C-alpha cells in the first residue's frame, strides 16, 4: 500500500524539477490538464495549435530562459521539442497562492506573447520574414553563430505563410545582398539596416550592432 507521503512525493516529482525531452518529443498536448509551467534550460521548444481542419498554427519558438505553458485549466496548444531539450517545470499557482512569489517567469511568458503579436502585426511576407530573421539574430547571446534548428515549414507555419513564400523570400533577400547563404544551413546578415527597413524598422535602436557578423544556423533554410 502506497502511503500518503509517497503519493505526495510522486506528485511533486511529476510537477517539479528538471525534465529532458529528445528532439521531436511531445512535452504536452493540446487539451491536457495544465498543472505546470516550464522554463527552457537548454535547447528549443515550439508550441503549436491544431485546428479542426488539420491546419497547424505554430504559435512560438522558445529559447533558453524562455517560459511557456502558462495556461488556464486546459492546454490551448501543444508543446514539442525542436531539439534535445532540458526544461525546468513548476506547478501553476492560483492567485493568492504563490503566484506573487515568482513574478518574473510570468512576465517573461507575457513578453513572449508580445513578441508573437508584434511579429504577426507585419502585413507582408517580406515584413514578416525580415522581422523573424532580425529577432533570431538579436536573441542570440553569442557573438557568432545562432542555431535555428526549425525547418522552413516551421517558419512558414509560424508566420502564417506558405512554404514556397518563405523559401522565395529568403532567396530574394540573398539576391538583394541583405543576407549571405552559406550552403543550406547557414546565413549571414550583411545589411542590417536594409533588413530592418524591410521589417518596418521593427527592432530596438541597439539591435543593429548585434546583427552584424551573426551567422544563423537555419535548418530553417531546409525543408
Model-derived features with residue positions:
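A short beta-strand-loop-beta hairpin characteristic of the jelly-roll/cupin
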Residues: 45-57
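Short phosphate-coordinating micro-motif centered on Lys-Gly-acidic
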Residues: 27-32
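Cyclic nucleotide-binding regulatory module and flanking cytosolic helices
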Residues: 1-23, 63-68, 73-74
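Polybasic "coupling" helices that flank or enter modular domains
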Residues: 99-163
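Glycine- and acidic-residue-biased ligand/ion/polar-headgroup-sensing regions
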Residues: 24, 35-48, 64-65
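Phosphate-/nucleic-acid-contacting segments
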Residues: 137-223
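Cyclic-nucleotide recognition modules
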Residues: 58-111, 115
Amino acid at each position: 500500500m502506497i502511503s500518503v507521503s509517497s503519493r505526495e512525493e510522486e506528485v511533486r516529482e511529476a510537477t517539479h524539477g528538471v525534465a529532458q525531452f529528445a528532439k521531436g518529443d511531445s512535452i504536452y498536448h493540446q487539451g491536457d490538464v495544465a498543472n505546470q509551467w516550464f522554463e527552457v534550460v537548454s535547447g528549443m521548444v515550439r508550441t503549436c495549435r491544431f485546428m479542426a481542419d488539420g491546419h497547424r498554427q505554430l504559435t512560438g519558438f522558445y529559447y533558453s530562459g524562455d517560459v511557456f505553458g502558462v495556461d488556464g485549466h486546459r492546454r490551448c496548444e501543444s508543446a514539442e521539442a525542436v531539439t534535445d531539450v532540458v526544461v525546468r517545470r513548476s506547478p501553476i499557482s492560483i492567485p493568492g497562492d504563490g503566484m506573487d512569489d515568482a513574478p518574473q517567469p510570468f512576465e517573461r511568458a507575457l513578453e513572449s506573447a508580445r513578441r508573437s503579436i508584434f511579429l504577426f502585426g507585419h502585413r507582408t511576407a517580406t515584413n514578416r520574414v525580415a522581422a523573424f530573421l532580425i529577432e533570431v539574430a538579436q536573441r542570440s547571446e553569442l557573438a557568432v553563430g545562432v542555431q535555428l534548428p526549425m525547418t522552413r515549414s516551421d517558419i512558414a507555419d509560424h508566420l502564417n505563410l506558405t512554404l514556397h513564400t518563405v523559401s522565395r523570400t529568403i532567396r530574394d533577400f540573398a539576391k538583394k545582398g541583405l543576407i549571405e547563404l552559406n550552403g543550406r544551413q547557414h546565413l549571414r546578415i550583411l545589411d542590417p539596416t536594409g533588413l530592418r527597413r524591410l521589417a518596418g524598422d521593427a527592432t530596438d535602436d541597439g539591435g543593429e550592432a548585434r546583427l552584424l557578423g551573426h551567422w544563423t544556423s537555419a535548418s530553417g533554410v531546409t525543408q
